[in-house]
Amino acid sequence: MDNTNRPHLNLGTNDTRMAPNDRTYPTTPSTFPQPVFPGQQAGGSQQYNQAYAQSGNYYQQNHNDPNTGLAHQFAHQNIGSAGRASPYGSRGPSPAQRPRTSGNSGQQQTYGNYLSAPMPSNTQTEFAPAPERNPDKYGPNANNNQKKCSQLASDFFKDSVKRARERNQRQSEMEQKLGETNDARRRESIWSTAGRKEGQYLRFLRTKDKPENYQTIKIIGKGAFGEVKLVQKKADGKVYAMKSLIKTEMFKKDQLAHVRAERDILAESDSPWVVKLYTTFQDANFLYMLMEFLPGGDLMTMLIKYEIFSEDITRFYIAEIVLAIDAVHKLGFIHRDIKPDNILLDRGGHVKLTDFGLSTGFHKLHDNNYYTQLLQGKSNKPRDNRNSVAIDQINLTVSNRAQINDWRRSRRLMAYSTVGTPDYIAPEIFTGHGYSFDCDWWSLGTIMFECLVGWPPFCAEDSHDTYRKIVNWRHSLYFPDDITLGVDAENLIRSLICNTENRLGRGGAHEIKSHAFFRGVEFDSLRRIRAPFEPRLTSAIDTTYFPTDEIDQTDNATLLKAQQAARGAAAPAQQEESPELSLPFIGYTFKRFDNNFR
């Protein structure tokens, strides 16, 4: 076979003839055969190739033509097995199939209509019917597990995007610092410090925290759904306050939205007026919040110890509480549970807010129907015996401070119970008429009243009586005659404990700051001045200012293990978390960037 006329690339050397050799190459069609449709001449393409071969000398007559040689012989032989019957019936040749000819490519061929797909036979079904969906065969938790996986994936990408934005913001801040200095050593220090922190944070994200990493020193508080413990991290000895919440109680008492709201506000807040949250984690039974430990105790402990405050001391603490509430409002949240128990004092004696709506109050008892019946005098719930004095029946004066403190201690025990204390809650929350940010300013007024008078304005022996007094505040608000208050102090209290339309602070915290009672107060520098009370601490784990003697020191985890052992259930570490208890808490885990760098 002569290979001198094989096609080759046009590289400017087409006039150079390749040296012939004795190697044999396979022959293939130069162009893929085109289908021939009715009315089309099959020889048109071949005539074009012949004409092109004459002018360009790229083809020869009958060279690489499959109509000659073996291709022509095989076209007239049956070299396969017997054909099988098609379920679709008989059909014509495919349009892509080259027509079999006897070398006469100019012969006209006739074909059927190949533009419409062949239809299956009416007597035979093409596909078997699809089986009916039966998710129950996979177990009752199949749908919950599907939702859990979907939520996990969604939260994973949301957290990744959020961390990327925060990292870009930190990079912008670092570049700004680099641009403010020309000192090479200073720039190198800023760069290396930022890189080290980012690396530590990435490693911190990959670690899994658990309660076994911390040693419990003492239980410093208990609420309706959990407890707060003073703990020390075993790895580095740092001291924290660990709040643990029981998942089953959160689920039963409809507190799922509240627990997530508390986590979100503490995670988003970086204010000095709000307790700092470092990390959150969970296991099969508990939710854990690792927060900063504030050794000064709470404002209720100070009221029990000092009974009443002077107007100057009251002015200081109320001014700081105003800034703390305003910081929460700027984050878009309403605290709704401002009370002395939730106002903590740090090492310097300054105020910080904590416990965002979880420990007390907002569950079945806050149903609108309950208060409708209560206002109609249909309440038949028996009174609970909390060893309280009959404050509603006695005349509160300065001379019976012992009875007032007995009431305060009983009220603290009530705060530990599932009933909670309604003394500081605004009436619009009870009546269901809708409430806004100004409901926290009502609570501020009741706290100010207690600091100056010695008891809340609507306190009573029974919580139902307290509800009645709050709702009918116009008739029950009373200032004792034997206690002299300044004109500005009483005016501020009355401007806060009033209907929501006229309440001071409805337009913002600046309305309260500009009141005459705070004349001369520099709100911007409050945390830089010395507080009226500074805790005297002997160590980093000193709990002198917490009522630990009144709190049962048996933690909830120990009680849960004992209950499960009595039932013969698996240990908490070996339990598999059910979708009902895991699905609502997906995305609860949080790790602050500066957790390991304080």
Swiss-Prot record:
SMART domains hit by this protein: S_TK_X (SM00133), S_TKc (SM00220)
GO CC annotation terms, alphabetical: cell cortex of cell tip; cell division site; cellular bud neck; cellular bud tip; growing cell tip; incipient cellular bud site; mating projection tip; nucleus
GO BP, sorted A to Z: budding cell apical bud growth; cellular response to salt stress; cortical actin cytoskeleton organization; establishment or maintenance of actin cytoskeleton polarity; intracellular signal transduction; maintenance of protein location in cell cortex of cell tip; positive regulation of establishment or maintenance of bipolar cell polarity regulating cell shape; positive regulation of exocytosis
Classification via InterPro entries: AGC-kinase_C, Kinase-like_dom_sf, Prot_kinase_dom, Protein_kinase_ATP_BS, Rho-assoc_Ser/Thr_Kinase, Ser/Thr_kinase_AS
EC numbers for this chain: 2.7.11.1
Region (Disordered): 1-46, 80-148, 163-190
Catalysed reaction, written as an equation: L-seryl-[protein] + ATP = O-phospho-L-seryl-[protein] + ADP + H(+); L-threonyl-[protein] + ATP = O-phospho-L-threonyl-[protein] + ADP + H(+)
Cystine bridges: none
Keywords, sorted A to Z: ATP-binding, Kinase, Nucleotide-binding, Phosphoprotein, Serine/threonine-protein kinase, Transferase
Active site residues per record: 337 (proton acceptor)
Binding site for ATP: 220-228, 243
Domain AGC-kinase C-terminal: 519-598
GO MF terms, alphabetically ordered: ATP binding; identical protein binding; protein serine kinase activity; protein serine/threonine kinase activity
Residue ranges constituting the Protein kinase domain according to the UniProt record: 214-518
Compositional bias annotation for Polar residues: 1-16, 24-33, 99-126
Family named by the database record: Belongs to the protein kinase superfamily. STE Ser/Thr protein kinase family. COT1 subfamily.
Descriptive protein name: Serine/threonine-protein kinase cot-1
Native organism: Neurospora crassa (strain ATCC 24698 / 74-OR23-1A / CBS 708.71 / DSM 1257 / FGSC 987)
Lineage of the organism: Eukaryota, Fungi, Dikarya, Ascomycota, Pezizomycotina
